[in-house]
């Protein structure tokens, strides 16, 4: 703070030009001065601009139909899951806008649980939602979490990932999305409460409760364990949307048992047994998750349940070709950089889809199958300048035959050398 000294003469504010006699205080900097009135005015301008930015951020939340249309560009199938997610996300950010206004009715948060087999698109759906809304997004693995005080990650480290995704802008992170994968792996081992401590199962569920509901959490800036005399980042989780996903292997048997108890008469059991997995998953209820091993308090904080179906051959073929960043488009672009045209025949795409179904890896396994097929092609083609086109046939995928190569002079080469798929 600058103090008045008569010997130095009158000092003026560098911004408004008022003398020190005309204002209450002057703050001195290196060769400049600012009065209390200008400080107050600048503060108002900055606060007004920041307030406007905050309002604009979620002013134009896409409508559920618009959200689903964008999801359709990246994710094939899963129509019911897309609809559930579109409505839940729209309501969540509409709620944030509503709660920022003074009102008697405060809307509570609806987190989401996604149930579906490996490779059905759970993570991709969550990532695409964050991209649509332009909000910070973080993925956490529930299997690495443990209850506080035990070896493993504290649940607060999930929040640190979101803060890092927001470039340490806490206010922005407080309106982000967190996807917790493998949530089914923290289910307790039996339906009944255990007398022994389950630090990586029920203990993690207990630790996540407050964060899911909404609390001001203390996060260590460098991650790791908390310890005394350490600085923390304070983050309010009230407006963070949590999406918890898992395969929940075996839950269809729990659903079958529940449905079987409600059907009476001869042949009732056979009717339930005939139901396919995707039909069963669409009938999942909170009581099924309870029997699977999630605690009631945890289930209560995930009111929206979106079930995803296992992908069939037709859906996998569409995944290979239709989305904006489809694998076939990616590999075609890659070979274009070597001035070679790449073509996948229809039966080749079908064979790739069949292999993925056999391996039970869903869409996630498609890339590894194509990598195996394309390995020799991508190894040899850069060294040759006589090839115009490479055709992947059904035999290339199913029997390991070499791809058909069309040379620039029109010659077609199809060697019998085996390639691994």
Curated annotation (Swiss-Prot):
<dbReference type="InterPro" id="IPR003959">
    <property type="entry name" value="ATPase_AAA_core"/>
</dbReference>
<dbReference type="InterPro" id="IPR019489">
    <property type="entry name" value="Clp_ATPase_C"/>
</dbReference>
<dbReference type="GO" id="GO:0005524">
    <property type="term" value="F:ATP binding"/>
</dbReference>
<keyword id="KW-0143">Chaperone</keyword>
<dbReference type="InterPro" id="IPR050052">
    <property type="entry name" value="ATP-dep_Clp_protease_ClpX"/>
</dbReference>
<dbReference type="GO" id="GO:0051301">
    <property type="term" value="P:cell division"/>
</dbReference>
<dbReference type="InterPro" id="IPR004487">
    <property type="entry name" value="Clp_protease_ATP-bd_su_ClpX"/>
</dbReference>
<dbReference type="Pfam" id="PF07724">
    <property type="entry name" value="AAA_2"/>
</dbReference>
<dbReference type="GO" id="GO:0008270">
    <property type="term" value="F:zinc ion binding"/>
</dbReference>
<dbReference type="InterPro" id="IPR010603">
    <property type="entry name" value="Znf_CppX_C4"/>
</dbReference>
<dbReference type="GO" id="GO:0009376">
    <property type="term" value="C:HslUV protease complex"/>
</dbReference>
<keyword id="KW-0862">Zinc</keyword>
<dbReference type="Pfam" id="PF06689">
    <property type="entry name" value="zf-C4_ClpX"/>
</dbReference>
<feature type="binding site">
    <location>
        <position position="38"/>
    </location>
    <ligand>
        <name>Zn(2+)</name>
    </ligand>
</feature>
<dbReference type="GO" id="GO:0051082">
    <property type="term" value="F:unfolded protein binding"/>
</dbReference>
<dbReference type="GO" id="GO:0046983">
    <property type="term" value="F:protein dimerization activity"/>
</dbReference>
<feature type="binding site">
    <location>
        <begin position="117"/>
        <end position="124"/>
    </location>
    <ligand>
        <name>ATP</name>
    </ligand>
</feature>
<comment type="similarity">
    <text>Belongs to the ClpX chaperone family.</text>
</comment>
<feature type="binding site">
    <location>
        <position position="13"/>
    </location>
    <ligand>
        <name>Zn(2+)</name>
    </ligand>
</feature>
<dbReference type="GO" id="GO:0140662">
    <property type="term" value="F:ATP-dependent protein folding chaperone"/>
</dbReference>
<keyword id="KW-0547">Nucleotide-binding</keyword>
<dbReference type="InterPro" id="IPR027417">
    <property type="entry name" value="P-loop_NTPase"/>
</dbReference>
<comment type="function">
    <text>ATP-dependent specificity component of the Clp protease. It directs the protease to specific substrates. Can perform chaperone functions in the absence of ClpP.</text>
</comment>
<keyword id="KW-0067">ATP-binding</keyword>
<dbReference type="InterPro" id="IPR038366">
    <property type="entry name" value="Znf_CppX_C4_sf"/>
</dbReference>
<keyword id="KW-0479">Metal-binding</keyword>
<protein>
    <recommendedName>
        <fullName>ATP-dependent Clp protease ATP-binding subunit ClpX</fullName>
    </recommendedName>
</protein>
<dbReference type="GO" id="GO:0051603">
    <property type="term" value="P:proteolysis involved in protein catabolic process"/>
</dbReference>
<dbReference type="GO" id="GO:0016887">
    <property type="term" value="F:ATP hydrolysis activity"/>
</dbReference>
<dbReference type="InterPro" id="IPR046425">
    <property type="entry name" value="ClpX_bact"/>
</dbReference>
<comment type="subunit">
    <text>Component of the ClpX-ClpP complex. Forms a hexameric ring that, in the presence of ATP, binds to fourteen ClpP subunits assembled into a disk-like structure with a central cavity, resembling the structure of eukaryotic proteasomes.</text>
</comment>
<dbReference type="InterPro" id="IPR003593">
    <property type="entry name" value="AAA+_ATPase"/>
</dbReference>
<feature type="binding site">
    <location>
        <position position="35"/>
    </location>
    <ligand>
        <name>Zn(2+)</name>
    </ligand>
</feature>
<feature type="domain" description="ClpX-type ZB">
    <location>
        <begin position="1"/>
        <end position="54"/>
    </location>
</feature>
<dbReference type="Pfam" id="PF10431">
    <property type="entry name" value="ClpB_D2-small"/>
</dbReference>
<feature type="binding site">
    <location>
        <position position="16"/>
    </location>
    <ligand>
        <name>Zn(2+)</name>
    </ligand>
</feature>
């Amino acid at each position: 703070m600058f103090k008045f000294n008569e010997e130095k003469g009158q000092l003026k504010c560098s911004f408004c030009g008022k003398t020190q006699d005309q204002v209450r205080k002057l703050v001195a900097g290196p060769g400049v001065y600012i009065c209390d009135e200008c400080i107050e005015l600048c503060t108002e301008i900055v606060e007004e601009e920041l307030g406007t930015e905050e309002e604009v951020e979620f002013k134009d939340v896409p409508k559920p139909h618009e959200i689903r249309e964008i999801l359709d560009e990246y994710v094939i199938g899963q129509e019911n899951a897309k609809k559930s997610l579109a409505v839940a996300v729209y309501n969540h950010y509409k709620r944030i806008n509503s709660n920022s206004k003074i009102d008697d009715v405060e809307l509570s948060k609806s987190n989401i649980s996604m149930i579906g087999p490996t490779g059905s698109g759970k993570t991709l759906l969550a990532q695409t939602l964050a991209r649509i809304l332009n909000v910070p997004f973080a993925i956490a693995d529930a299997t690495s979490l443990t209850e506080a005080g035990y070896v493993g990650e504290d649940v607060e480290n999930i929040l640190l990932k979101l803060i890092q995704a927001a470039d340490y802008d806490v206010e922005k992170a407080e309106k982000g999305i967190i996807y917790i994968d493998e949530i089914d792996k923290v289910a307790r081992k039996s339906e009944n409460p255990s007398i022994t401590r389950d630090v990586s199962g029920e203990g993690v569920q207990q630790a996540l409760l407050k964060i899911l509901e909404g609390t001001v959490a203390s996060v260590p800036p460098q991650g790791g364990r908390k310890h005394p005399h350490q600085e923390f980042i304070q983050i309010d989780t009230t407006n963070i949307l949590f999406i918890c996903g898992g395969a929940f292997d075996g839950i269809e048997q729990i659903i079958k048992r529940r449905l079987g108890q409600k059907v009476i008469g001869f042949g009732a059991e056979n009717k339930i047994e005939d139901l396919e997995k995707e039909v069963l998953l669409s009938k999942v209820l909170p009581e099924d998750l309870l029997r699977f091993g999630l605690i009631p308090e945890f289930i209560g904080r995930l009111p929206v349940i979106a079930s995803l179906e296992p992908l069939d051959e037709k859906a996998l073929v569409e995944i290979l070709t239709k989305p904006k960043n489809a694998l076939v488009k990616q590999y075609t672009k890659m070979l274009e950089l070597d001035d070679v045209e790449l073509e996948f025949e229809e039966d080749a795409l079908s064979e790739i889809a069949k292999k993925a179904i056999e391996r039970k890896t869903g869409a996630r396994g498609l890339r590894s199958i194509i990598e195996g097929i394309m390995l020799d092609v991508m190894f040899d083609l850069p060294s040759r300048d006589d090839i115009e086109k490479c055709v992947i046939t059904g035999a290339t995928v199913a029997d390991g035959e070499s791809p058909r190569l069309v040379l620039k002079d029109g010659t077609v080469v199809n060697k019998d050398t085996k390639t691994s798929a």
